[in-house]
Amino acid sequence: RTLAMLAANDRPLFREGFGPSAQGFTHVEWGDIENLKNKIGKHVAAILVEPVQGEGGARKAPRGYLKLLQDIANENGSLLISDEVQIGMGRSGTLFAYQQENIEPDIIALAKGLGGGFPVGAVMAKAKVGDAMIPGTHGSTFGGNPLAMRSANAVLDLLLEDDFLKSLRENIIYFENKMDALINDDDKVSPVILRKKGSGMLRGFQLTENITAGDFGNISREKGLLLVGAAENTIRLLPPLNTSKE
């Protein structure tokens, strides 16, 4: 299972040192629907997509892209899988990121925010998929861990509180405005920030050639701010969902 997920990732950095690589995965250019159409057919079991890429450089799927993916999957009898490990559980401004495109994936992968800091992962699936997952087709060393389940329930209780997501969306707008101000402070274009990226509370700054994401992260850490880099020379910003404007 671990080798399969490594093969699903298209970054050699994560696959180096592990092998042999699982076969059967085809990678397509992000957001390029024609590229996808040329590589998919009735032989494809499923399309796996991350609505907002984290490691890929805080890249949000173009408007309408997820709906096109679902249409293509339906036409070919393929499943649509939404990877919500990083963007799910409210980080997009809705409980799940796919909800903003009004689609219905067949499978959803969750982790990270699901446990609020405690290690936990989950897979949700439609009945037609779940019914096929008989004992032995899927396994987990710590599946159903009581402490992990309690942590996930606590997170869900908070996210589903009245007005929590509404307040979060207001903070997302405030956050985005502050990002704009950093790029164009007093109409002076930043010498290191090229543009903002991402969506919701998964944001990023693509940096100019003047500095690498690694160096930017090191400088930030020295000043007491922990940031993480990503593809396309991007620095990611992932504040807690309960962060206040102050």
PLM features per residue range, with description:
Residues 1-246:
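Conserved N-terminal phosphate-binding loop of PLP-dependent enzymes in the Aspartate aminotransferase
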